[in-house]
């Protein structure tokens, strides 16, 4: 694939992600009910939102992987880096595979670090890459951590996608040689418990569930196919909420992404065991539709509302939130029981 073809594909992904963006997502958060406390017995000043992570993050949200690899997406990455710095949140790069193949595309990713010189940045490679490529991706961004993305469904539907999914040896090798923490993530189809246990056996500690309900790369890649013949995979995978239930009790440090649309969604994900929550489609949508300044104001208010919701629930930190009363819908409770998953 030529550089122009690679760049065009990256631009297509952004266009289609925005085209298929849904303001009301179907990630399962509507099936989770946090119960109101009439006597919260707390103060907003007492709320500590700092996540229980060894990354020194100040907020329990981060901007998740999106883009890079073309002049247009490079401009978006510059805005995203600037936004992350202004908000004081971590940010993950889009997949750097194209820049590893073509060094001329490196600036479209490195602009994240240029605009967020002191922030926490996660590099990003696919699980098909070896340890040397992972090291190069980290060096490209002077990254603080590395995401390894799992995207089998996307690759199957992508006309030019990979067809080799023998990934576990690569993951194990990257973990063994990496100088930075590793986060293994799905890109929108979620996890089941068996795969999470396999990751544990490889030495993985940090997992982003990347559940169904947000940006759907199977749908995006199907739109790029002439016959659009994979439409039936639109609902493939486990939702973000189902994936969090699958992870309970395993001892992994979970991050949650996929279909997060509100501060309440964030708090629900945290209550289900996520230590931090990522957003990508929401951020991209606001940047494209409203511009940088309005997006910054929106997410500043978003962060403030997290503090308000903690106080409303009568909790002051993540540990206390784990004890907040919660009810699952009948369908979600049936899923939990059918899968033999721990209670909440």
Swiss-Prot record:
Residues where Mg(2+) binds: 155
Function in brief: Involved in the biosynthesis of isoprenoids. Catalyzes the 1,3-allylic rearrangement of the homoallylic substrate isopentenyl (IPP) to its allylic isomer, dimethylallyl diphosphate (DMAPP).
Residues that bind FMN: 65-67, 95, 124, 185, 215, 259-261, 280-281
Organism encoding this protein: Lacticaseibacillus paracasei (strain ATCC 334 / BCRC 17002 / CCUG 31169 / CIP 107868 / KCTC 3260 / NRRL B-441)
Catalytic reaction(s) noted: isopentenyl diphosphate = dimethylallyl diphosphate
GO terms for MF: FMN binding; isopentenyl-diphosphate delta-isomerase activity; magnesium ion binding; NADPH binding; oxidoreductase activity
Keywords annotated in UniProt: Cytoplasm, Flavoprotein, FMN, Isomerase, Isoprene biosynthesis, Magnesium, Metal-binding, NADP
Gene3D superfamilies reported for this sequence: Aldolase class I
Subcellular location: Cytoplasm
Biological process annotations from GO: isoprenoid biosynthetic process
Classification via PANTHER family: ISOPENTENYL-DIPHOSPHATE DELTA-ISOMERASE (PTHR43665:SF1)
Family: Belongs to the IPP isomerase type 2 family.
Chief localization: cytoplasm
The protein, known as: Isopentenyl-diphosphate delta-isomerase
Protein EC: 5.3.3.2
Protein residues bound to substrate: 9-10, 154
InterPro entries from the UniProt entry: Aldolase_TIM, FMN-dep_DH, IPdP_isomerase
EC class: isomerase
Cofactor: FMN; NADPH; Mg(2+)
Assembly information from the UniProt record: Homooctamer. Dimer of tetramers.
Gene Ontology CC entries for this record: cytoplasm
Taxonomy, superkingdom: Bacteria
């Amino acid at each position: 694939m030529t550089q122009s073809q690679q760049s065009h594909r990256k631009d297509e992904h952004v266009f289609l992600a925005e085209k298929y963006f849904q303001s009301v997502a179907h990630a399962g958060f509507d099936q989770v009910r946090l119960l109101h406390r009439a006597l919260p017995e707390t103060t907003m000043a007492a709320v500590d939102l700092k996540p229980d992570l060894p990354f020194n993050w100040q907020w329990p949200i981060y901007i998740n992987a999106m883009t890079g690899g073309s002049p247009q997406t490079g401009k978006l990455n510059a805005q995203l880096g600037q936004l992350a710095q202004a908000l004081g949140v971590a940010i993950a790069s889009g997949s750097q595979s194209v820049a590893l193949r073509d060094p001329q595309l490196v600036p479209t990713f490195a602009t994240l670090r240029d605009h967020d010189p002191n922030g926490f940045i996660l590099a990003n490679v696919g699980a098909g890459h070896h340890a040397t490529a992972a090291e190069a991706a980290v060096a490209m961004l002077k990254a603080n951590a590395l995401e390894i993305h799992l995207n089998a469904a996307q690759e199957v539907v992508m006309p030019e996608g990979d067809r080799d999914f023998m990934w576990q040896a690569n993951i194990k090798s990257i973990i063994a040689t990496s100088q930075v923490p590793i986060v293994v993530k799905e890109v929108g189809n979620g996890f089941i418990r068996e795969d999470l246990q396999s990751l544990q056996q490889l030495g993985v500690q940090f997992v982003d569930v990347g559940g169904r309900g947000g940006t759907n790369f199977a749908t995006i890649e199907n739109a790029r196919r002439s016959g659009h013949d994979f439409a039936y995979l639109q609902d493939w995978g486990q939702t973000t909420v189902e994936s969090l239930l699958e992870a309970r009790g395993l001892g992994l440090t979970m991050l949650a992404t996929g279909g997060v649309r509100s501060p309440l969604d964030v708090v629900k994900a945290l209550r289900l065991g996520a230590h931090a929550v990522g957003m990508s489609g929401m951020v991209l949508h606001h940047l494209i539709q409203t511009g940088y300044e309005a997006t910054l104001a929106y997410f500043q208010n978003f962060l403030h509302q997290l503090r308000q919701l903690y106080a409303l629930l009568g909790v002051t930190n993540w540990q206390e939130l784990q004890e907040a009363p919660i009810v699952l819908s009948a369908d979600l409770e049936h899923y939990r029981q059918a899968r033999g998953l721990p209670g909440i």
